[in-house]
Amino acid sequence: MKRRELFTGAGQAPAGTCCKPGVSRMATLIPNALFRTQDNKPVRFYDDVIKGRQVMVMMMYANCETFCPLATQRMVELHHQALAPRMGKDLFMVNVSLKPEQDDPAVLKSYAQMHHALLPGWSFLTGDRYDVDTLRYRFFSHDHIGIDQDPDQHAGLMKIINDPIGRWFHADAFASTRTVLEHIQWSDPPKALAERLKDNRKLQERIDRDRVLYGYRKIA
């Protein structure tokens, strides 16, 4: 079955959206539904999971035999390759079950253990069907109802949310390591000018080096 094509980009608030003074824009966009973690701990999705944090959100279900285990394995690899120093500190990962009727906290914990995903800053959530569908519709809805109702079409798709600066990005867990890391970097808080100029110089050096080696910029 073909997975739906993913377009990447920054999330924007709907026209006319406004917030009360002192209230995050994300608080008006993200459901604050009650979920339970793999440790059976009750959490509110916005207040306890998203608020004040930079969070990668991905959908899955435990008995999935297609994209879910591959996406989980991919994120475990990224954790060990590059994300471990940040996870649980200024970067978090959360997987939300698409089949909450089957995936209670114990099932999610078993899934996480099987895939070596019980890692710092990484949570697995389950909740009521209505709340899961509301969350999925907010983050990963598709105009075609048949595609939208197929759980496999949502597995592996990721939303990177940065609450403090009010931005979110679409990403795909199956993209290259560099691409996923670039999406995470794009959602990071803005850097100071001197640091941005330094990063730009490094990027230009890499582009120049790739041109010499390959005759074009290599995409890894």
Language-model regions: role of each:
Residues 45-71, 75:
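Short active-site neighborhood of thiol/selenol oxidoreductases, capturing the structured segment around
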Residues 118-179, 185, 193:
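Thiol/selenol-based redox catalytic cores and closely related redox-interacting motifs
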